[in-house]
Amino acid sequence: MKNLLTEKCISSHNFHQKVIKQRMEKKVDSRYFKDGAVKKPYSAKTLSNKKSSASFGIRRELPSTSHLVQYRGTHTCTRQGRLRELRIRCVARKFLYLWIRMTFGRVFPSKARFYYEQRLLRKVFEEWKEEWWVFQHEWKLCVRADCHYRYYLYNLMFQTWKTYVRQQQEMRNKYIRAEVHDAKQKMRQAWKSWLIYVVVRRTKLQMQTTALEFRQRIILRVWWSTWRQRLGQVRVSRALHASALKHRALSLQVQAWSQWREQLLYVQKEKQKVVSAVKHHQHWQKRRFLKAWLEYLQVRRVKRQQNEMAERFHHVTVLQIYFCDWQQAWERRESLYAHHAQVEKLARKMALRRAFTHWKHYMLLCAEEAAQFEMAEEHHRHSQLYFCFRALKDNVTHAHLQQIRRNLAHQQHGVTLLHRFWNLWRSQIEQKKERELLPLLHAAWDHYRIALLCKCIELWLQYTQKRRYKQLLQARADGHFQQRALPAAFHTWNRLWRWRHQENVLSARATRFHRETLEKQVFSLWRQKMFQHRENRLAERMAILHAERQLLYRSWFMWHQQAAARHQEQEWQTVACAHHRHGRLKKAFCLWRESAQGLRTERTGRVRAAEFHMAQLLRWAWSQWRECLALRGAERQKLMRADLHHQHSVLHRALQAWVTYQGRVRSILREVAARESQHNRQLLRGALRRWKENTMARVDEAKKTFQASTHYRRTICSKVLVQWREAVSVQMYYRQQEDCAIWEAQKVLDRGCLRTWFQRWWDCSRRSAQQRLQLERAVQHHHRQLLLEGLARWKTHHLQCVRKRLLHRQSTQLLAQRLSRTCFRQWRQQLAARRQEQRATVRALWFWAFSLQAKVWATWLAFVLERRRKKARLQWALQAYQGQLLQEGATRLLRFAASMKASRQQLQAQQQVQAAHSLHRAVRRCATLWKQKVLGRGGKPQPLAAIAPSRKVTFEGPLLNRIAAGAGDGTLETKRPQASRPLGALGRLAAEEPHALELNTAHSARKQPRRPHFLLEPAQSQRPQKPQEHGLGMAQPAAPSLTRPFLAEAPTALVPHSPLPGALSSAPGPKQPPTASTGPELLLLPLSSFMPCGAAAPARVSAQRATPRDKPPVPSSLASVPDPHLLLPGDFSATRAGPGLSTAGSLDLEAELEEIQQQLLHYQTTKQNLWSCRRQASSLRRWLELNREEPGPEDQEVEQQVQKELEQVEMQIQLLAEELQAQRQPIGACVARIQALRQALC
C-alpha cells in the first residue's frame, strides 16, 4: 500500500513539473530570493519549535528600518508627511513586536542570530531588489501552485504513514496479546487439570491404601499383609511414575515447540523490520542526492550559456561523484546483506546446537533415572522375597491345624472379592467424571473458535471501510486540484508571461553579473550547512547505535549471570537431595543390619516397623522431589517469560527511538525542494527509469532469496523435528515394551512363587495345628499392639495430608493473586503508553499547524509589501505621465476617458473579486481539510493535551463549524453585503487623462491582498487626518441591532491600508454576478478582523444571546452609499489623512471577543473532560467484566473499590453532560455573534 501511494505521488509530481517547466526556465533567481532576502527552506528546528516558528516567519519578511519605501505621492513630498510615515512605521513595528511577544513568548538566541543574518542579507540585496520587483508576480503564482501541491502531497503521505503505522501497531499488539493470552490460558488449564488429577489420584490412593492396610492388619497376619501392601505400592508407584514421565515429556515437547516457534517468528519480524528500514533509508538517500543534483543544475543553467565547455565538465564531475556515492551505497548494502546472512546462519546453528544439547542432557537424565529406578526395584524385590521366605518358614513351623487353614482361605477369598469390587467402583467413577468434563471442554473450544472468527471478521470490515474512505478522499482531492487549481494557474501564467517576456530579455543582461556572485555565495553557504548537517546526523546515528549496543550488552550480561547462578543453585540442590537420600538409605540399612543380629522372635515387629517407616520415608522423599522439580520448572518458565518480556520491552523502546529518528530525518528531507529543468529532462528520465528497473530487479531477487532461505530453514527445522519425534517415540515404545515384558515376567514369577509357597504352607499347616492353642493368646496380644500402632500412624498420615492440601490451596490462591496483579500492572502501563503516544501525536500536529500558519503569513505579508511598492512606482509613473499630458490638454478626451474608465473599472473590480474569491476558496478548502484532519477526525474528540490556550489559530471557518456542531445548532449561512466603493486616486487620474487607462488596467489586473492588523492606522490622537474628497463626505445612516455600532466604528479595523475582499463594491453600471456556493463561505481572515470595533459591546452581547439564531440585519447603506472610511486597493499608493477615530469602541469589542474566546475554550475543555471520563468509565467496566469471569476470594475488596470509583466517574459524567447541555445556548449565541462580526467586516 505504501509503495503504491509513493508511486502515485511521484507520477502526479512529474505531471505537475511538466505543466510548469516553461515558467521555470529563466526565473531561477525568483525561487531563492524574495524582497532581497534569501528564501531558505524551513529546517527541522523551525518546525519543531512551536513558539517561535510563526514569529520568525513574520519577522523574516519585514522591511528593514534603514531602507524605507519612498512613496512619492502628494502627502509624502513634504517633511511633515515623511515624519508622519516614519511615526506610522515605528508604531506598527512596536505593536507587531508586542503581539509577537504576547503570542509566542521571548525569542531564543539561535533565532536572533538567524534573524540577524537575514537582516544582513537584506542590506546586501537592497539595490538588487529595485530591479527584481517585476518578476515577483510570476514567482508568486508559481510558488503558490507548487507549495499547494507539495503541502497536499506531504499531508497525504503523512496521513497515510500515520494510519499505516497505527494499523500495524494495533495489529501487532493484538496478535501479541492474543498469543500471550492463549499461552497463559493453555498453561493455566493444563496446570489446573494436572493438579486436580494429582490431588484426586493421591487422595484415592491414600484412601485405598489406608482401607486395605486397616482391613489386612485386622484379618491377615503381619508378614502376609506387609508383603501384599508393598507389592501394591510398587505397582502403583510404577504406574504413577510412568504417567508422570509421559506427561512431563509431552509438556517439555510442547514448551520447546512453542519457544522455538516464538523465537522463529520474532527473528523473522526483526529481519523484515531491518530490511524495510534499510530500504527506506537508501531510498531517501538516493532521492536526496538526485534532488541536490537537480538544484545544482538549475542554479548553474544561466552561467552555462557563457561557458558551455566548463559547464559540461562540471556536469561530468558531478555525475561521477554521485555515481560513486551510489555505487558505494550499493556495495555497503550488499556487505550489510552478507553480514545479516552470516549472522542468521550462526543464529540457526546456535539454536540447533542448543536444542541438541538440551535433548541430549534430557536423555541422559532419563537414562540415569531409569537405571536408579531399576536398581531400587531390584533391591526392594530381593528384600521382599527374603522377608516373605522367612515369614513362610515361621508360618510353616507354627501352623498345624486344619481349621486355621480353612478360615484363612475363606478370608482370602473375601479380600479378593472386596478388592475386585473396589477396583470396579473406582474405574466407573473415573469414567463418569471424564464423560461429564468432555462436553465442557468441547464447548469451550467451540466458543473460543467462534469468538476469534468474529473478531477477525470485524477487524477486516473496519480495514476495508477505512481503505475505501481513503481512496474516495484521495480521488476527490486529485479531481479538485486538476479541475480548479492547475487551469487557473496556467491561464494566469500564460497571460502574464507574454507581457513580461520583453522586459525579461532587457533586464537579464544587467542582473547577470550580480546574480552570479550571489549564486556563488549562496551555494557556499548551502554547502557548509549541508556538510555540518551531515556531520551532526552521523554523530546522532553513532550515539544511538552505541547506546543500543550498550543496553543490549548489559541486558545480556545480567541475564547470563542470573542463569549461571540459577543453574549452580539447582545443581547444588540436586546434589544435596541425592546426598540426603543416600544418607537416609544408608542409615536405614545399618539399622536393619544391626537389628537383624538379635533375637528373631522378639524383634520381628520392630524390624518390620523400621522397614515400613523406611518405605514411607522413601515415598515421601520421592514425592517431595517430584513436587520440587515441578515447582522449579514452573519458576524457570516464569523467569524465562520475564526475560523475554524484558527483551521485548527493550526492543520496543529501541524501535520507538528509531521511529522518532526516522521521523526527524523525514521531516528534514521533506524540506528540500526539487526543481526540474528542460535541458536535462530526457537524461533524468532515462536515469530514473534505469534505476527503477535495477531496484525492482534487486528487490525481486532479495524477495526470492529471502523466501528461499525461509523455506530452507523451515524444511530443515521440520525434518529435525520429525526425526526427533520419531527417535523419542521409538525410545518410548521400546521402554514400554521392556516394562510390559518385565511386568509379565514378574507376574509369572509371582504366580509360581505363590503356588510353591501355598503348597508348602498347606503341608506345614497340618503340623502347626497342634501349636495353635499355645500361640493364640500371644497372637491376640500382638494384634492389639499392631492395631494401636496402625491407628497412630494413620492419624499422623491423615494430618500430613490435610496440611498438604491447605498449603496447596494457599499456593494456588497466591499464584492467582500474583497473576491478576501482574496483568493489571501491564494493563496500566499499556494505557499510560497509549495516552503518551496520543499526546505526542497531537503535539506534533500542532507544531506542523503553527509552521504552516507562519509560512502562509510570511507569504501574505511579502505579497502586501510588494503590492505597496508597485503601487508607489505606478503612482510616480502616472504623475510623470500626467505632467506631460497637461502640457498638451484635451478636455474632451478626458471626459470620454472618464466614461470609459468607469466601465473598465467595473470589469476590473469583477475580475478582482472573482480572483480573490477563488483564492479564498482554495485557501479555505485547504484550511478546512487540515482542521478536519487535525481537530475533528472522524467525529472523535481529541485528548485534553491538545488544548493549548496560549495558541490562536487564524483559520476560523472549521472552528466555528465544529463549535456549532458541538452545540447542536446548524451552520449559519452568511452573505456578503455589496457596497459601492469610490474611484480613488487612480480613478481620478483616469477621469482626467485618457492615456493613463492602459497603465491603470495593467495596475488593477493584480489581486489585492489583505492588510494585517499591525499595519493599520493608529488612533486619532496620534495622527489627525483630513476628511476624504471626491464624493466621500456623505453621512452614514444608522444601522439597527448588531451591525450599526460596529459599522459606526469600522475605521478602527478597516483603514486605508487593509483591503479586504468584502470591501470591493460595484460602481454605477452592470451589477456583479453572485458567486455560487454550496455552503457557508468561511474566509481566512487576518487577526485584525477580530479587533474591537464598537462602543456598545455589552449591549450587543446581550442582544445576541437573546436571539442566537437570527441573522443580523444588513443596512441598506452598505449597498448604495460608499463608506467614507473604507479605501480601495488603488488608494494604497498615497497616504491621505482620514477622519479622527476613538479607541473606546475598540476596547469594548476586544473585551467582548476575549469573553467569547474564554467561553469557547471552557466549552472545549468541558467536552474533552467528558470524553476522558467516559473512556475511564468504559475501562473500569471492562476490568470488572474480566474480573467477574474469573472471581477470587481476595478480589472482592478490589472489586468494591473499583465499583465505587465507577460510580463517582458516572456522577461526574452526568454533571459534565448537564453542564454541556446548559452551555449550548450561550455557545450558539457566541457563534452567531462571530458570524455577525465577520459579515460586518466583509
UniProtKB/Swiss-Prot annotation:
Q: Which Gene Ontology MF annotations are present? A: phosphatase binding
Q: Where is this region: Disordered?
A: 1017-1038, 1053-1081, 1101-1122
Entry's localization field: Cytoplasm, Cytoskeleton, Microtubule organizing center, Centrosome, Centriole
Task: State the UniProt keywords alphabetically.
Answer: Cytoplasm, Cytoskeleton, Repeat
Start and end residues of each stretch annotated as Interaction with CETN2: 111-130, 475-494, 641-660
> InterPro entries, alphabetically?
CACF_protein
Q: Name one GO cellular component term.
A: cytosol
HAT repeat extents? 138-170, 172-201, 270-302, 334-368, 399-431, 1148-1180
The source's domain of life comes to Eukaryota
Q: What is known of its domains?
A: CETN2-binding regions contains a conserved Trp residue in their C-terminal ends, which seems critical for interaction with CETN2.
Instruction: Give the protein's biological function.
Output: Plays a role in the dynamic structure of centrosome-associated contractile fibers via its interaction with CETN2.
State the family named in the UniProt similarity comment for this chain. Belongs to the SFI1 family.
Report quaternary structure and partners.
Interacts with CETN2 (via C-terminus).
Q: What is the name of the protein in this document?
A: Protein SFI1 homolog
